A protein has these predicted regions:
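Short, well-ordered beta-to-alpha junction loops that form the rim of enzyme active sites
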Residues: 58-59, 131
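Active-site/ligand-binding-proximal alpha/beta "capping" segment
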Residues: 124-135
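Short Gly/Thr/Asp-enriched flexible loops that form oxyanion-binding sites at enzyme active sites
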Residues: 63-72
Length: 136
């Protein structure tokens, strides 16, 4: 994780109000090797817990969560911000205040891919207010 710390220090920019701009390697452009390393690190720290699914919010959490899912050999489910017409009826929905967008977003997950018997590992990009994590 030292590489992530170094990347944040060299390329991240604090914008105030708890917002860290990391779009050069995570939120807009992705440093795939770094996100692979981050996901593997999280997977290794939490392996052995019987995880059956990894859950994240679109979009920024997908890259590290995908790496963790590959490492743990489990499916990755990401909460959508808009319900596509192809999604099953009665999806799980929860509102979350976006720290970076400054508005409330609805996170939506199909019940086809998440059940009460799953052991879910929630992995998102950065923790600012924990509102996304709570919604997930």
């Amino acid at each position: 994780m030292q590489r992530l710390k170094d990347k944040i220090l060299s390329e991240g920019k604090y914008l105030g109000k708890g917002i860290l701009k990391v779009d050069s390697f995570m939120n807009h452009q992705i440093d795939a090797h770094l996100m692979k390393e981050v996901g593997e690190e999280f997977a290794n720290r939490f392996k052995g817990l019987g995880t059956t699914r990894i859950l994240t919010a679109e979009t920024s959490g997908i890259a590290p969560a995908l790496s963790a899912a590959l490492t743990l050999d489990v499916p990755l489910v990401f909460a959508r911000k808009n319900k596509p017409v192809t999604m099953a009826d009665n999806p799980y929905k929860e509102a979350a205040q976006s720290h970076t967008h400054g508005k409330t977003l609805e996170l939506i997950v199909s019940p086809e891919y998440l059940s009460s018997s799953d052991r879910v590992f929630i992995l998102d990009d950065f923790l600012a207010s924990a509102k996304t994590i709570k919604a997930l």
